[in-house]
């Protein structure tokens, strides 16, 4: 019985160990430029291969169609070791991601 408990405990500990060091990732680069109400730009890069850049611009200022148009790109390394990249826009027509791994409608 004691050996069963010890084996079960060892299995539980082994299963709890993270497979990737993402919890220890460090921020290598961070930029943030708040242009005020008319726009923004920011980006970051982490030690585990994540990158993200985004900018936004206010369009049609002072009209009923006023809105922000966002453009960006992010990438990350998946559990399979492949780097996935997505470029996107978001605005009046919704969120539009584009990436080699994303199916096209």
From Swiss-Prot:
A GO CC annotation given for this chain: chitin-based extracellular matrix
Record keyword Methyltransferase present: no
Disulphide connectivity of cysteines: none
Domain Chitin-binding type R&R: 37-105
InterPro entries (alphabetical): CHIT_BIND_RR_consensus, Cuticle_Struct_Prot, Insect_cuticle
Protein name: Flexible cuticle protein 12
Keyword Signal: yes
Signal sequence bounds: 1-16
Single GO molecular function: structural constituent of chitin-based larval cuticle
Keywords linked to the UniProt accession: Cuticle, Signal
Lineage: Eukaryota, Metazoa, Ecdysozoa, Arthropoda, Hexapoda
PROSITE patterns in the record: CHIT_BIND_RR_1, CHIT_BIND_RR_2
């Amino acid at each position: 019985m004691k050996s069963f408990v010890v084996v079960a405990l060892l299995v539980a500990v082994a299963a709890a160990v993270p497979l990737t060091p993402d919890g220890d990732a460090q921020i290598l680069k961070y930029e943030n430029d708040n242009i005020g109400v008319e726009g923004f730009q920011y980006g970051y890069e982490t030690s585990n291969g994540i990158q993200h850049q985004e900018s936004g611009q206010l369009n049609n200022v002072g009209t009923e169609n006023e809105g922000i148009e966002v453009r960006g790109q992010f990438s990350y390394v998946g559990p399979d070791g492949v780097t996935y990249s997505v470029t996107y826009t978001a605005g009046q027509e919704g969120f539009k991601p584009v990436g080699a791994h994303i199916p096209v409608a």
